[in-house]
Curated annotation (Swiss-Prot):
Superkingdom in the source lineage: Eukaryota
Entry's localization field: Cytoplasm; Mitochondrion
Cofactor note: Binds 1 potassium ion per subunit.
Keywords: Cytoplasm, Isomerase, Metal-binding, Mitochondrion, NAD, NADP, Nucleotide-binding, Potassium
Record lineage: Eukaryota, Fungi, Dikarya, Basidiomycota, Pucciniomycotina
Protein's name in the database: NAD(P)H-hydrate epimerase
Organism: Puccinia graminis f. sp. tritici (strain CRL 75-36-700-3 / race SCCL)
Amino acid sequence: MKEDSTMTYLTQKEAQEIDAELMGPKYGYTLAQLMELAGLACAQALHKVYGPERYPRVLVCCGPGNQGGDGLVAARHLWHFGHKPTLYYPKQTDKEHYKSLLRQCETLGIPVIGANFSEAVGETDVILDAIFGFSFHSEPRAPFDEPIRSFQQTQTPIVSVDIPSGWDVETGNPNHVYFTPNVLVSLTAPKRGVKSFPGRHFLGGRFIPPGIVKSYNLKLPCYPSSDQVVEITAVQGEDK
């Protein structure tokens, strides 16, 4: 665990341990609950920066794992916030909860595509990157190598969920091999690899029990009003 005067930055192992403890017998959270809270936070952060008046069309890029589940939840909330999301979801899972999340999007009329990514990028106002999370540790392969390469080249604003796809959770993107999003929404606590992230940075995790904050000695900012996210760009900038 890496700490400074105002913020805790987690390693991959610590992030996994906190998730496991949240879903353990003491706290009783389910994966579905955590996914819902994470997706809501991501949707709220995107909406704050890229409102639907100027950025109505959102291309939500979902991977096959939990990160993709966060994206499915976010797409639904973005629709309710007045955006016009489209799901890029080329590698769907057979897990029942993910099927339910997808069905919820489809009943709202949210388009779902699995190909023609470059065409979809040209028809959107902002991208939500929910492809790979903090457990990913290899070179991106098809069908996700194309969008991650495109992220490096596009001028369309990108919002990434928790860790930008392709980045290492602990070392980040030191050689600038991968794209740097405009906005990052860290979940629970920011990860070590994003400590030097230069863009606008939000934290979503307004559900962490005091017992976990205490046992992991987490240093986290206060959330304003009833918001599910807090901007930590200024706090992070002060720590550089």
